């Protein structure tokens, strides 16, 4: 074999390896925008069950009290009581937005960047703590309501 044929073989072999390697890479991850996060935050708020006195949930987003301190520390590096969370709608929205942003990014990955599937999974997690829990009943109805509001709120492409 001469030098030219060896070089040609190496070039073809190298091209084949690069092609196979590129095919094995996952599709480019779609970046979740602030507008999408805001749309989901608003959808979760609008879809939340009506607040009733002493229902054990706090704010317009109906957050369980055991999440509030943990989420506040994660998002703001400050502790917050459920009563403080309830009393300060701006701070509550900021914390919810922080958590929902991470949640939506995770669900985008889990749904192969499918927008509505990611939103459905996020809504399920928000209500139950399990992204796949909205198969039927009240949780499925809630997830559908979140999707409907999200579609109205999200930025048009």
Residue ranges and their predicted role:
Residues 56-78, 124-126:
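Substrate-binding/active-site groove segments that recognize
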Residues 117-157:
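Catalytic and substrate-binding regions of cell-wall glycan-acting enzymes that process beta-1,4-linked
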Residues 18-27:
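C-terminal segment of classical bacterial N-terminal signal peptides
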Residues 32-52, 63, 96, 120-130:
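Short, functionally critical alpha-helical segments immediately adjacent to catalytic or ligand/cofactor-binding
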Residues 33-37, 53-57, 61, 85-93, ...:
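Solvent-exposed, acidic/flexible segments
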Residues 45-53, 69, 73, 97-108, ...:
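Sec-exported extracytoplasmic/periplasmic mature domains
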Residues 74-120, 128-131:
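Alpha-helical segment that forms one wall of the substrate-binding/catalytic cleft
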Residues 2-14:
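Bacterial N-terminal signal peptides that target proteins for export
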């Amino acid at each position: 074999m001469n030098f030219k044929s060896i070089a040609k073989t190496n070039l073809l072999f190298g091209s084949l390896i690069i092609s196979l390697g590129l095919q094995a890479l996952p599709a480019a991850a779609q970046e979740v925008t602030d507008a999408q996060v805001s749309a989901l935050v608003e959808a979760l708020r609008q879809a939340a069950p009506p607040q009733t006195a002493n229902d054990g949930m706090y704010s317009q987003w109906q957050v369980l009290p055991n999440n509030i301190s943990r989420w506040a520390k994660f998002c703001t590096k400050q502790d917050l009581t459920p009563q403080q969370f309830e009393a300060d709608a701006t701070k509550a929205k900021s914390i919810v937005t922080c958590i929902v942003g991470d949640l939506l990014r995770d669900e985008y990955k889990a749904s192969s960047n499918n927008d509505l599937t990611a939103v459905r999974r996020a809504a399920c997690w928000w209500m139950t703590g399990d992204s796949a829990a909205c198969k039927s009943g009240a949780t499925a109805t809630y997830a559908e309501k979140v999707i409907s509001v999200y579609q109205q709120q999200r930025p048009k492409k």
